């Protein structure tokens, strides 16, 4: 059994090392070593990962790699790929990697190779998408189905929604895709205003097919549809299920022949590679969905086979642990300089925060070190005019990932070069900052009075020394996106192994759902509620007083 993390020898060495270098500025590290970029950057199949703008030295990296070895990282990676039940609180394997196992090597679960099942579902998806795209699968009116409506929440929504937006340039001509996740009826109502029952194809995505939000939205969508359809039989042409629960799918009224399955060893936030990605394949075409899988598979091989020192997910995870546990960063911004990646930060919020937002070890002991951090972000350059002020001059230490492509899908004049000039400038500014001498020289050059110069200097100082990573790739393609998503998955897994937490359960989402089940019947009628604390009682009772005003 591994020792408690804070008792690990390498952890103590890192603490001592931090004490020695905590006041070093990255400006000086770059000035002292012209080869710093070469030493602290890696390239994977054309994707550049630059981590040189972090407050690390070669000794830091050596000690972090020692930590990874002491925490038996390589063995943990092998256990996941071997199909061992590493999700220990649910006694399940974690095999999203099997879903994109393009080499088709056997992956065993309880003595049975899962790959034949995976391949059958992929083949069914391909045939179904082909029929829809060719117009062979038509609606009750005989019209082609052109509006794909994905109804799901969490992993059944965030991944497919992010991927379809990111890869819009690859969309099938004549098709639109819509996503409904929120129980707030507004989202479904506004979506239904934009489509026609005759051309709508609803994909109901729910692992259990009992998720309250998804089933409520699905029933409302069905009721809307049946008001236009000739009879219940029309449902068979317009409603598809993606689930593990055949009986609940049948109970809803969907023909099991129209159900695409996946398995309990696929976690929700890791499920876009499965039949949950059906809306992706319908919108982009199966060939592009398979390219997404190919990119992820290549990153899987890199993660599994590459020595730790050249292993991009491992290095990113270790640098993240350094920033979180030693520098004290509690917030991490994801900043894609690509409008198509607008949903990428929201996708990573679930991936990282639901995976590693844990307060006990795998063995149930309380941790006394930080695990995970707050993930957020927005596309550049929008963020520069909104929250970058805090990144540059605020008191919290906020680390960041910058992502950009060298080539735009929409080359308009100098737009892309201007975009990338900002991408490069922001990472340099966060690292370098601007000291008093530079500020003073600028102000004096502007011919300001001496008193005005002195008054403005503190406001125009940039401390710099703010850590960031940069990802630069040729073009945002299905393959590239697949590799990037898999990179983040493996980074999260690596950090979970180091912290000795289970990155694959999510018990933290349960309590609120349980309480909501209790509260829902209390919202009926006009009786005053007094079964909760005074704040919750007060909120419920005020709602009941004003709801019909």
From Swiss-Prot:
Keyword hit for Nucleotide-binding: no
Q: Where in the cell is it found?
A: Cytoplasm
- Report which reactions are catalysed by this protein: alpha-D-glucose 6-phosphate = beta-D-fructose 6-phosphate
Give the GO biological process terms: gluconeogenesis; glucose 6-phosphate metabolic process; glycolytic process
Q: What is its main location?
A: cytoplasm
The GO molecular function terms of this record are: carbohydrate derivative binding; glucose-6-phosphate isomerase activity; monosaccharide binding
* EC category name: isomerase
Q: Does the keyword Translocase apply?
A: no
Q: Which domain of life is it from?
A: Bacteria
Key words of the record: Cytoplasm, Gluconeogenesis, Glycolysis, Isomerase
Q: Where does the record place the catalytic residues? A: 354, 385, 513
* CDD domains, A to Z: SIS_PGI_1 (cd05015), SIS_PGI_2 (cd05016)
Family, according to the entry, reads as follows: Belongs to the GPI family.
Entries under NCBIfam families matching the protein: PRK00179.1
Question: What is the name listed in the Swiss-Prot or TrEMBL entry for this protein?
Answer: Glucose-6-phosphate isomerase
